[in-house]
């Protein structure tokens, strides 16, 4: 049995959590707290890195104290302390990294520097039915849209990706276009509930292959964003009031269609019977319902991260750290820094005596 304190400050959510992993692989979230900066950044239409870093410094100490007290543990009783160290906003990442390394050194605990995307992949382990590899992961968030095959030995292979905007980024930009505010995902979902998703025909962006045809698993959302812009411009020439509900529903539907169709095709083509969906956009109701229904029709078992752990949180970072501890991974060097970008398939390099950054 292992227990960890986990910290997350990669973007605009300050978070801390304490988790415990049982011998049979079950993970208990003993305490989890998040301090969101959404309202403050909404004034600017997006995340302001300097503001995010300052708010993390203010919020994180109180969050750590709260989760440790709620979990009924002391830092000295934990097996390790974990923090996100890549990818993300460099200044924001430093807050969790420095805090985690300092606490680990003071209490003589191992430190685990976790890849943020590995945390998202581990978030499905916080549900009722932990997944056993092999399975295909659709990671769909504000910064990433990727299809990742997780092998039985834990190895990860990327089979599909977005070549421009991530799905979550497209939601934010279209929400801004429609005057719906930030963050875009929840704003569009709320307005789309009463809309006609078939009113506007929008493109399902595809990526051309050099020899002809299209890549079956890759994504492109920039063309969809442009199509929405042109549709709105045309409507404004003919009406004083935009049909916001229909526009939002049509956009939301085409994003869901693209993600579901290409993900399930990828799983079927690779003979994978399990598909896991994680990331902030995985909280979207239309996408969740469509993925579950169509997966069932095609005989592919679909698991989705619990709603509470779809968006950025520390529990998912703790889950990833616990899985590393279960694999007897080495700890992260106290000399390690942070990196705004780092490939997920090189996450093992974070657990070596010589840090990659």
Curated annotation (Swiss-Prot):
Keywords: Acyltransferase, Cytoplasm, Iron, Metal-binding, Transferase, tRNA processing. SUPFAM superfamilies: Actin-like ATPase domain. It is an enzyme of class 2 (transferase). It is found in: Cytoplasm. One of its GO terms (biological process) is tRNA threonylcarbamoyladenosine modification. Substrate binds at residues 139-143, 172, 185, 284. Gene3D superfamilies: 3.30.420.40. It catalyses: L-threonylcarbamoyladenylate + adenosine(37) in tRNA = N(6)-L-threonylcarbamoyladenosine(37) in tRNA + AMP + H(+). Binds 1 Fe(2+) ion per subunit. Required for the formation of a threonylcarbamoyl group on adenosine at position 37 (t(6)A37) in tRNAs that read codons beginning with adenine. Is involved in the transfer of the threonylcarbamoyl moiety of threonylcarbamoyl-AMP (TC-AMP) to the N6 group of A37, together with TsaE and TsaB. TsaD likely plays a direct catalytic role in this reaction. Belongs to the KAE1 / TsaD family. This is tRNA N6-adenosine threonylcarbamoyltransferase. It comes from Synechococcus sp. (strain CC9605).
């Amino acid at each position: 049995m292992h227990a960890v304190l986990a910290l997350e400050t990669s973007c605009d959510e300050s978070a801390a959590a304490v988790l415990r992993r049982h011998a049979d692989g079950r993970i208990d979230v003993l305490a989890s707290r998040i301090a969101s900066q959404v309202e403050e950044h909404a004034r600017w239409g997006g995340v302001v890195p300097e503001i995010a870093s300052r708010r993390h410094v203010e919020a994180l100490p109180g969050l750590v104290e709260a989760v440790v007290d709620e979990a009924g543990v002391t830092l000295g009783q934990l097996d390790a302390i974990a923090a996100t160290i890549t990818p993300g906003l460099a200044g924001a990442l430093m807050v969790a990294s420095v805090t985690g390394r300092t606490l680990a050194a003071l209490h003589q605990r191992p430190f685990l520097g976790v890849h943020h995307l590995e945390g998202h992949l581990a978030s499905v382990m916080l549900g009722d039915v932990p997944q056993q590899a092999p399975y295909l992961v659709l990671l769909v968030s504000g910064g990433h849209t990727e299809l990742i095959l997780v092998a039985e030995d834990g190895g990860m292979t990327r089979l599909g990706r977005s070549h421009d905007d991530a799905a979550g980024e497209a939601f934010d930009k279209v929400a801004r276009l429609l005057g719906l505010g930030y963050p875009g995902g929840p704003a569009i979902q709320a307005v789309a509930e009463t809309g006609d998703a078939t009113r506007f025909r929008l493109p399902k962006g595809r990526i051309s292959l050099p020899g002809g045809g299209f890549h079956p698993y890759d994504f492109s959302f920039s063309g969809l964003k442009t199509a929405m812009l042109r549709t709105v411009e045309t409507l404004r020439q003919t009406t004083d009031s935009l049909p916001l509900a229909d526009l939002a529903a049509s956009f939301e539907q085409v994003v869901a269609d693209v993600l579901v169709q290409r993900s399930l095709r990828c799983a079927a083509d690779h003979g994978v019977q399990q598909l896991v969906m994680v990331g902030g956009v995985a909280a979207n109701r239309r996408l969740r319902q469509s993925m579950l229904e169509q997966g069932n029709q095609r005989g592919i078992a679909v698991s989705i991260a619990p709603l509470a752990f779809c968006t950025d949180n520390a529990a998912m970072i703790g889950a990833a750290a616990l899985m590393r501890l279960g694999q007897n991974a080495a700890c992260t060097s106290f000399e390690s820094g942070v990196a705004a970008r780092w490939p997920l398939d090189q996450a093992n390099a974070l657990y070596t005596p010589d840090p990659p950054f």
